[in-house]
Amino acid sequence: VRPCSPPRPRRGSASHRACLIARYNFIYAKERLEAEAALRRYVCDLETVQRIIYIAVVESFRSAKMAFWKVKINVKDTLAICHRGGPSSLEVAVLDYIACHKDLYDVCCSVHEVVCSMNRNPKLPCPGEVDFVVISGLIRELCCLAFSMQTLIPPLDIAFGIDGECFNRDMYYRSFDSDFTAPFVAYHVWPALIEDGTVIVKGEVVTKK
């Protein structure tokens, strides 16, 4: 961590939050589809492709949040030396500092970690069938976005879904190829974005009987 320097003012956090939410929507609308197209060269089944991307999102957020936690500890230890306010103001100063110095995050390490984790996932095709490096661009964008979302108060996160759960219309949209009378989620296409337990952006699922 660098020597103490003035953090970015938090008054811009509302616009920063809006930009991060917009970025999440953009990744869903464009870069997710590009990743699907890249995977379809190796995997014919659309369901498998969508499962791969969903797990990539979940693993990217998990890896980025873990990396953020480690960076935050180091930054807090350093800023505490010269900080003159209370614990709450130190917390804000730490978040502002990390938001201002994004290069503290080694995103390449997270991308590698996510790819390795996916290669070991028993629900996905084995590494010999498809190399998940083909969607490393998507993984990188998700990791960077997830890391930045942790600098908000409260942070933004994704809701982790489970196959077979009851369909929640407040949290998900049904995919176009769903059985619209089915009450259960067959699999998840895209996770919902949440803030302090409240759904900010709905996810997408496939429902089948």
Regions found by a protein language model. Name each.
Residues 1-209:
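Extended, amphipathic alpha-helical stalk segments that mediate dimerization
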